[in-house]
From Swiss-Prot:
Modulates RecA activity. Pfam families: RecX_HTH1, RecX_HTH2. InterPro entries: RecX_HTH_1st, RecX_HTH_2nd, Regulatory_RecX, WH-like_DNA-bd_sf. It is found in: Cytoplasm. Belongs to the RecX family. GO terms for biological process: regulation of DNA repair. Residues 1-22 have a biased composition (Polar residues). It comes from Mycobacteroides abscessus (strain ATCC 19977 / DSM 44196 / CCUG 20993 / CIP 104536 / JCM 13569 / NCTC 13031 / TMC 1543 / L948). HAMAP family: RecX (MF_01114). This is Regulatory protein RecX.
Amino acid sequence: MTKSSRPQSISDSVSVAGSQGTLDDLRARVASVPEAPTREPVDSRDEQAWSYCLRLLTSRARTRAELTERLARRGYPDDVSERIMDRLATAGLVNDADFATQWVQSRHTYSGKGKRALAAELRTKGVSAENAAAALAQIDGEAERSRAAELVTKKLRSENLDDGGIKAARRLVAMLARRGYGQSMAYDVVKNALASEKDRRDVG
C-alpha cells in the first residue's frame, strides 16, 4: 500500500485532549465511514454494535479495550466485538499505539503528569505494555524533570516561606508524587526551586 492510500490513523486526525477543531476532525472522520459494510452483509447485531462504537468515537478517541468493554456492557458477544474492532482498526478509527502516543503527549504537556501516572492511566485504558512503553519513551528524564520544575515554580510564587519553606516543600513534593513523579526527582526539583525562589525574594 502506498503512503497516499493508507487508512488515516487516529494521530492524523485527533488529539486526545486537543482543541474543538481536532474533535470536529474526528467526528468528520467517523461520519465518513459507512454505517453498513460495503463488501459483505452482516447481521443486525453487528450493525448495531458498529453504530454504537461510531457514536462513542464522536466524543473522543478510545482504545480497543475501552470499546470492547462498552460493547460487553451492552451484552454483545465476543465474536461480534472482535469483528467490529477489526473493522474499526481497518478504517483507522482504533489504533492503540496512536492513542497512547497522543495520550502521553497531551497529559504530560497540559496536565503535567509524570511517567508513573501516565503508565497507570494507559494500563487502565487497556493499552498493551509494548505500546505504553513506546509512548512513554517520548518523555526522557530531562523533559520530565523540566515539566516538574515548571509545576513547582508556578506553585511556589504563592507559597508562604516564613518557616524556611519546610511546609511548602512538603506540599510540593506531595503534589509531584500525586502527579506521578518519582520521590527522588520530586525532592531534588523542589529543593532547587525553593532555593531559587528564596533568592528571588531576597533580591526583591
